[in-house]
Amino acid sequence: MTKAIATIVLLIATIINISCDNSTIYNKYINADTRGWGKNEVMEYTIDSIAQTGTYNLTLGLRINNTYPFQNLNMLISQTIYPKNITYTDTITCRVTDRQGKMNGYGVTLYQYSMPAATMEYTKGDSIKVRVIHNMKREVLPGIVDI
């Protein structure tokens, strides 16, 4: 009986170790203004130096509360790679709610969203500056807590 339990525990531990992904090189949220995210409020993130040449996935995370008034959130994301001084820009749309107004994110009063933004090749020593702005018609978006 104890041998069977030990085998199950070992199997679960192995699965957990295999599924863990330790490749995150940068993770940061910036708080939006308490009134909401302003159209001219640029969220800027700087990655000082890439340690290893390779392919990296850029993922954008959001935290939104239930006062956000729209179904979607459109954002412009640009990343400048130094020392090459090359800038890539893309538009990302986050589907915040379904058609009935139910939040699609994870959470109870604060909803978490995670969206793939880009897959990029970086060279060892590159530094990256990522800028995110919202691309909605409304000047200030209430309900946006962190980006």
Regions found by a protein language model. Name each.
Residues T91-E121:
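An anionic, turn-rich surface loop/hairpin at beta-sheet edges
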Residues K28-D48:
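Post-signal peptide N-terminal segment of mature Sec-exported envelope proteins
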Residues Q52-L60, M120-K137:
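Noncatalytic modules at the cell exterior or secretory-pathway interfaces
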Residues I64-T67, Q112-M115, H134-G143:
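Short acidic/polar inter-strand loop motif in beta-rich domains
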